[in-house]
Amino acid sequence: MSKVAFLGAGSFGTSLGILLGNKGVTVSLWDRDENVINDINVNRKNDKYIKDLTIPTNVTAYKDLDEALNGAEYVVLAVPSHVIRTACKNLKGKINDDVIIINIAKGIEEGTNLRLSQVINQELPNNKVVVLSGPSHAEEVSKGIPTTLVASSECMECAEKVQDLFMDKNFRIYTNDDIIGVEIGGAVKNIIALAAGVCDGIGYGDNSKAALMTRGMAEIARIGIKMGGKAETFFGLTGMGDLIVTCTSMHSRNRRAGILIGQGKTAEEAIEEVGMVVEGIKACKAFYELKEKEGVTMPITDIAYKVLFEGAKAENAVSLLMERDKKKEEI
């Protein structure tokens, strides 16, 4: 049976660790937080991130990275997007070239505007990378609620190995070779979810959210295709599927942050109240720069940028969005 090491014992990493542990896989969870480590190893819980769950005994938490990695055939990067490069640097010289790297973070590297698999390839060029993405909240995965994701890689053999590793009666995995499209969909949908939350916070209704999600889907496809993704990817699980769940669920930290901003809080205040990383804020800045560079029209991203980084009032920004020049509906 395989051994899987997770870098990061947060909500999603822990949930996937539980899933694998229940399948009989040996799982190690590496984290810096000694309280989290003790809670997992002593109490078989991780109350800091997810309540009301029991962690199997074949899931062990470590503070020592070498111990966590010992014997692992797969390493799952379960850390926020802005620390992916640091995490990969920490893996150098500690894993063999045949270890498959599985990334579950969604975002883009701030400053370089690289996709996360590109960052991983820069730091660990000899290891194959698989992106595991799609509509999934840790709170539901940990409870065994039916969930479907995509394992995407340039190496289809690796994607199929990850598919076999995670497939379970309540956890279905499809494979996909469009890693560009999968990563762009997973990153941009966080911006749209923020905007959807803002609409909820202002008090707008279902009409507004339906329009925003639909036109947001167009923005995702537009920038994704420009960057080399396949059109069909954006209408699958990692595009439309992920967009739906992130824009509509209260499990979504991006939507929750957007609600707070719509109610008048600043981005900084919203992040503090949510208490976890809000990837859509960093993604908004990165894709604002990328769409300028690539010459892609992304009006929702434009408006989100004005609210997040230029101090525009949410209601005024929505008016700007609605009052643009008339045009034909198209992607």
Swiss-Prot record:
Sn-glycerol 3-phosphate binds at residues 106, 134, 136, 189, 242, 252-254. The gene is gpsA. This is Glycerol-3-phosphate dehydrogenase [NAD(P)+]. One of its GO terms (molecular function) is NAD binding. The active site is at 189 (proton acceptor). It is found in: Cytoplasm. The keyword Lipid metabolism applies. NADPH binds at residues 11-12, 32, 106, 138, 253, 277, 279. PROSITE patterns: NAD_G3PDH. InterPro entries: 6-PGluconate_DH-like_C_sf (IPR008927), 6PGD_dom2 (IPR013328), G3P_DH_NAD-dep (IPR006168), G3P_DH_NAD-dep_C (IPR006109), G3P_DH_NAD-dep_N (IPR011128), NAD(P)-bd_dom_sf (IPR036291). The keyword Coiled coil does not apply. Its main location: cytoplasm. It comes from Clostridium perfringens (strain 13 / Type A).
